[in-house]
Amino acid sequence: KQTAYPVCGQGFTLTAALPAPVDGWEVGAYGIRTPVLARAETLPPETLDLVLAPCTAFDEAGRRVGMGKGYYDRFLPRCARAAVYGIAYEAQKVDAAAAGPLDVRLDGIITERGIYTWK
């Protein structure tokens, strides 16, 4: 198994990247370390087994709310065989997340209190 990391690109694209072993990281948006895409190996979304998606909110129906740019909304439908789990704090749980009709339902959420699963 390998661990790929998300790289946000122009046009609100998201790429799964394996960082190069030497000088493979840079500081990206929001001060977050991200793989240097020019030196990374990229993985096609359809080959991924598991995707961890950040959430600003989630509900018990498996709906997630992201940051509003749609990176994961465009990426997740291409991850047909992957289990998709959100990453959030328990305090981000809401009664009904404002997800849109194109949003991909999560298989579960991982919080500091445990793992919720729905599918």
Where are the regions a protein language model picked out?
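Extended, well-folded interaction surfaces typified by the phenylalanyl-tRNA synthetase beta subunit core
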Residues: K1-T42, Y89-A96
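Surface-exposed, charge/polar-rich loops and edge strands
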Residues: V27, V36-A38, E46-V51, D59-R64, ...
